UniProtKB/Swiss-Prot annotation:
Homology family: Belongs to the UPF0161 family.
Location (main, coarse): membrane
UniProt protein name: Putative membrane protein insertion efficiency factor
Subcellular location: Cell membrane
Gene Ontology CC: plasma membrane
Transmembrane segments: none
Amino acid sequence: MKKLLIRLIKFYRKYISPGRSSCCRFVPTCSQYAIDAINKYGAFKGSALAVYRILRCNPFCKGGYDPVR
């Protein structure tokens, strides 16, 4: 499951993301954060952390450096 999620994120980064403007307010980017979280915490908790991060990535959030802890 973990490998499948990471492959889906990499597919998104390679084929879908280049067509969009760069809009992530965080370092590392939300997709890299998702990969790091899934690798560190597994598919379930890592995905939950990634979804929470993506929800915070909006114009009303300051952003900045936010690594997986």
